[in-house]
UniProtKB/Swiss-Prot annotation:
It is found in: Cytoplasm. This is NAD kinase. It catalyses: NAD(+) + ATP = ADP + NADP(+) + H(+). GO terms for molecular function: ATP binding; metal ion binding; NAD binding; NAD+ kinase activity. Its EC number is 2.7.1.23. The keyword NAD applies. GO terms for biological process: NAD metabolic process; NADP biosynthetic process. The keyword Transit peptide does not apply. Disulfide bonds: none annotated. Belongs to the NAD kinase family. Keywords: ATP-binding, Cytoplasm, Kinase, NAD, NADP, Nucleotide-binding, Transferase.
Amino acid sequence: MNNHFKCIGIVGHPRHPTALTTHEMLYRWLCTKGYEVIVEQQIAHELQLKNVKTGTLAEIGQLADLAVVVGGDGNMLGATRTLARYDIKVIGINRGNLGFLTDLDPDNAQQQLADVLEGHYISEKRFLLEAQVCQQDCQKRISTAINEVVLHPGKVAHMIEFEVYIDEIFAFSQRSDGLIISTPTGSTAYSLSAGGPILTPSLDAITLVPMFPHTLSARPLVINSSSTIRLRFSHRRNDLEISCDSQIALPIQEGEDVLIRRCDYHLNLIHPKDYSYFNTLSTKLGWSKKLF
């Protein structure tokens, strides 16, 4: 065992037996290597592990040096919204579909992770968004997002009329089905499907991408990540929501605004030494193959 990582957390919500197999393999392998291992409580229960140290995501964030998330991008997003609050590095083993954020191949995870544990990895910080539903600047509801915050109707699709203020200065008004406010991490997710630009992860920028706007002049906008975005609504309805990473929904009531800003903390994401963002774009999204 080396001194790069001493305590390692195993995280993820397995949806099929192969993911559980990876969790069990990882746990037993790390134990034989002499690491202190904390297993997320649900995983330990499903694997029926005995005499094992378990914890919540928050406890793993407080106690571990590294969290290994086994699953797809949904698992990664759900775990890292909590883990980002703590001084912990995070890496993913892909047991989902796309696996854009989970770098390690499950068939070669031991060797790849062994190299990472020896200190051979690339580290980067990814910022999150904080979304608040407010009434007269009094916070009512709050959540965070790794990928994006989306304004959308609640149960029935319909057009929304709203105004966007950037740093309390009017920017534009819009009639559309909603608005996607995305981080660089999320620029290859929902935002990309809506026609938004791809932002490399190190950019300090936020994109605002209209969803099915009523006019042809409505285009995506890229702003500095230090800016604060305020959404105001012209026709007060009780069926609007904002969703964070398509996992958490916050209702918007009459007379309420939405404030979106960069979080005060970052996700400490790490990758294998041979990681390339542009290669990931090519292999995962079929982006721009080499011609010669």
